[in-house]
């Protein structure tokens, strides 16, 4: 199987996000890379499901709470930017202050 660098990056995000999801279900708090991967994954999947950029940006601040991440993580992630494939092409989605 031959994957482009972008495809490899997306697979890495998905792998880290699945780990983050498992940890959330067990009640564990996410660290910085896990939180970024989880948020990125939700954007990518939301775009794939047909949500708009505006919908994802509005919902993005509801996906993780401060009590779901380790101390200091919200301050380390003032925004998350992820390119996602929408029905009308690839677009950049920015989540501002995604952990509240």
Swiss-Prot record:
GO biological process, one term: urea catabolic process
Gene Ontology MF terms: nickel cation binding; urease activity
Gene Ontology cellular component annotations, sorted alphabetically: cytoplasm
Chemical reaction(s) catalysed: urea + 2 H2O + H(+) = hydrogencarbonate + 2 NH4(+)
InterPro entries: Urease_gamma (IPR012010), Urease_gamma/gamma-beta_su (IPR002026), Urease_gamma_sf (IPR036463), Urease_subunit (IPR050069)
Pathway involvement of the protein, from the record: Nitrogen metabolism; urea degradation; CO(2) and NH(3) from urea (urease route): step 1/1
Keywords linked to the UniProt accession: Cytoplasm, Hydrolase
Domain of life: Bacteria
Membership in a protein family: Belongs to the urease gamma subunit family.
Subunit structure: Heterotrimer of UreA (gamma), UreB (beta) and UreC (alpha) subunits. Three heterotrimers associate to form the active enzyme.
Protein name: Urease subunit gamma
Organism: Prochlorococcus marinus (strain MIT 9303)
């Amino acid at each position: 199987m031959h994957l482009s660098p972008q495809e490899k990056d997306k697979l890495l995000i998905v792998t880290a996000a699945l780990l983050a999801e498992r940890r959330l279900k067990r009640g564990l708090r996410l660290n910085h890379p896990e939180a970024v991967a989880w948020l990125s994954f939700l954007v990518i999947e939301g775009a794939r499901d047909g949500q708009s950029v505006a919908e994802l940006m509005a919902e993005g601040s509801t996906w993780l709470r401060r009590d779901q991440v380790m101390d200091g993580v919200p301050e380390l992630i003032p925004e998350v930017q992820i390119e996602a494939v929408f029905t009308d092409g690839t677009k950049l989605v920015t989540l501002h202050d995604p952990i509240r």
